[in-house]
Structures are given as C-alpha cells and as structure tokens.
Amino acid sequence: MDSLASGRWRRRRTEELPAAGDAKRACRRSEPGGYECSGHMLTTCALLSWSTEDQEPRPRGLPASQPDCSQERLSSMVLQNGGRSSAQPCLRCISGESGHFNHTDNH
C-alpha cells in the first residue's frame, strides 16, 4: 500500500526522502555551528555578547584589538551566543534558503 490513486498523498520510500540538509524546518538560532575562522571557533574571534556590560574594560590609550577574522566575514556569520538581535539574522535567513521559515513568523 505504498501508493494511492493519482493525485493523493502517499508515503515516500526511504530513497525518495530529501537529504538531511534539505528538510523544511523552522530556524533555531541555537543550531550548533562549527563556523571556523582562521583555525579558531568563531566565538574565540568575536565578542560573545553585543552588550557593552559584558565587555572587559580596556586600558585607556591602547587601540582596540582586532580579531583574527575579517570584519566582512564576521558580519555575515551568526555568532554562537544565541543572539536575539534582529540585526544578526541566521545564515539560513541570509541565504534565503528554500523552505526556511523566518523567525518573525511566530508573532
């Protein structure tokens, strides 16, 4: 009973199922990501929080240290801090992945 009359839904066979990366699902910002940057995990190259309260104070007169990653690459990646800012969308939202549900659909 694998198939029904034409035009009706039927259960797909294992070989017909989409690959794991093709599944349509809602985005979860906390998805594990092994995004590496210059041999380091992204969290070691960038701030863990956008909040200035979490940052250590820098001594006056010294320039701010630059991360090993390029600023262009950082702006296009999702930090592994589970960021909640709409200014930091996930990679799947940025790429416009087919079947990817936007985070704002929950509202």
Swiss-Prot record:
Its source organism is Mus musculus
The protein's superkingdom reads: Eukaryota
Where do the segments described as Disordered lie?
1-32
Basic and acidic residues composition bias: residue spans: 22-31
Q: What is this protein called?
A: Uncharacterized protein C10orf143 homolog
Q: Top-down, what is the taxonomic lineage of the species of origin?
A: Eukaryota, Metazoa, Chordata, Craniata, Vertebrata
